[in-house]
Amino acid sequence: MQGSMGLAPAIGLGMSLNTTRPVVVINGDGSLLMALGATHTLRDRAPENLFHYVLDNGCHESVGGQPVAALESSYPGVTEIIKVARGFKPSRVSVQPEENTRRIREFLAQTLPAGGWMRLPASARAQGR
């Protein structure tokens, strides 16, 4: 759902409530900031077939790479936005790129519902829109 401006978790929640199959939502940190209320709703509904994973590159990548203000002052430490993501538990936090493959495997092996977080470098390249 590139360009959905924060709607990916809500769409994933709707899908997960209408199927027994696993639903994987891969969200961006900028997108998450656009609809923080979705994390509260996901936590409260806690669908047993939903994975919500946040890719944190510190910017709104798909619309030009503008920095995400919540991350500017605290990266590489634990950020305020990660604390929000932890509200949808259990979550994993990865800030080292070399850990990402292992973290993804661990994440997918979790008991559902699950949430996760991965820090990535920004590319700020044109997204074709």
Regions found by a protein language model. Give the residues of each.
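Thiamine diphosphate
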Residues: 1-128
